[in-house]
């Protein structure tokens, strides 16, 4: 059993902080002590912009639109994420959550200082993801484990990828 602490870029399964009976899956972008900024749709960690490269647009098969698709690198992890250029950066409906005072919300987005023993999680479909920007930090005791493959995504088999 792999019992290493989550690292930036890892995709983790965790108990949802607002309802621990639910398991969620998101990418770790902030470790305890990090400052995470998502401003004008750009992610920075500890003042350093996350390296990104725009690639081809992603067609949403169930909808009639495309999203910009990027490749990003956090630490040793390279991954793809979607960004809807028409969606606002503003996070209008963030809830009250423990350590919310560690976050500053403005028209450009959010900046948060991750408290000790917690993680900041973001979804790879950035503009359609309810994640730490909305409901706060994930306590270490809520971490279930690291995800390592997509199981039965029948709508888009190409997303399954390969094992490493």
Predicted regions and their residues:
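Soluble "head" domains of membrane/secretory-pathway proteins
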Residues: 1-164
